[in-house]
């Protein structure tokens, strides 16, 4: 037996012992200095940063486009709703003089004359049916007295002293006003009470 074989533990070949000793030693990688950085790594990092920035810009553009689309859809819906609501405005404006004429005819008619009673009744029924029809389409009459003056629906043409009506309230309606779905299409011409 040689001296090498004597030093090895029983049953182990000398190669196995050397392998075990190498396993105990940690692999040490050589340190890379800043000067030895691979230029490809730097280029990859630069390209990744550019890609992230481009993705961020694209995301912002998509969000802005979606917001613009939502705003356009909302505006279009509002415009369509207004068009439906106020499509009758011109037609109602054309009917107002007819309604006013029927009102004036009733004011001046001699209701005490029995010969005119059928005509007066016909005018009243015609006016009532016309007002019923326009009410179905959102038209409301502004003709209340003893209510506070509202510049949105009233046009004051005179101020008169009154003890019966509070100052600043509508005393009399000279010409009725009308609204269409809440929008004033003709303000009521009124006289307003003032304090003595």
Swiss-Prot record:
The keyword Chaperone applies. CDD domains: GrpE (cd00446). Residues 1-41 are annotated as: Disordered. GO terms for molecular function: adenyl-nucleotide exchange factor activity; protein homodimerization activity; protein-folding chaperone binding; unfolded protein binding. GO terms for cellular component: cytosol. InterPro entries: GrpE, GrpE_coiled_coil, GrpE_head. PANTHER family: GRPE PROTEIN, GRPE PROTEIN HOMOLOG, MITOCHONDRIAL. Homodimer. Belongs to the GrpE family. Participates actively in the response to hyperosmotic and heat shock by preventing the aggregation of stress-denatured proteins, in association with DnaK and GrpE. It is the nucleotide exchange factor for DnaK and may function as a thermosensor. Unfolded proteins bind initially to DnaJ; upon interaction with the DnaJ-bound protein, DnaK hydrolyzes its bound ATP, resulting in the formation of a stable complex. GrpE releases ADP from DnaK; ATP binding to DnaK triggers the release of the substrate protein, thus completing the reaction cycle. This is Protein GrpE. It comes from Klebsiella pneumoniae subsp. pneumoniae (strain ATCC 700721 / MGH 78578). The gene is grpE.
């Amino acid at each position: 037996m040689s001296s090498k074989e004597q030093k090895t533990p029983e049953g182990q070949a000398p190669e196995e012992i050397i392998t075990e000793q190498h396993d105990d030693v940690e692999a040490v990688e050589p340190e890379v200095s800043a000067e030895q950085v691979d230029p490809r790594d730097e280029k990859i990092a630069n390209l990744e940063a550019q890609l992230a920035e481009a993705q961020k810009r694209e995301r912002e553009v998509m969000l802005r486009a979606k917001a613009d689309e939502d705003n356009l859809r909302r505006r279009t819906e509002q415009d369509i709703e207004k068009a439906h609501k106020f499509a009758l405005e011109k037609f109602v404006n054309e009917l107002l003089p007819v309604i006013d004429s029927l009102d004036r005819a009733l004011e001046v008619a001699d209701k005490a004359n029995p010969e005119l009673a059928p005509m007066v009744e016909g005018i009243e029924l015609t006016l009532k049916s016309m007002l019923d029809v326009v009410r179905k389409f959102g038209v409301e009459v502004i003709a209340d007295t003893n209510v506070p003056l509202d510049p949105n629906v009233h046009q004051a043409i005179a101020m008169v002293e009154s003890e019966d009506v509070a100052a600043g309230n509508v005393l009399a309606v000279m010409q009725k006003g009308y609204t269409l779905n809440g929008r004033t299409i003709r303000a009521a011409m009124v006289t307003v009470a003032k304090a003595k």
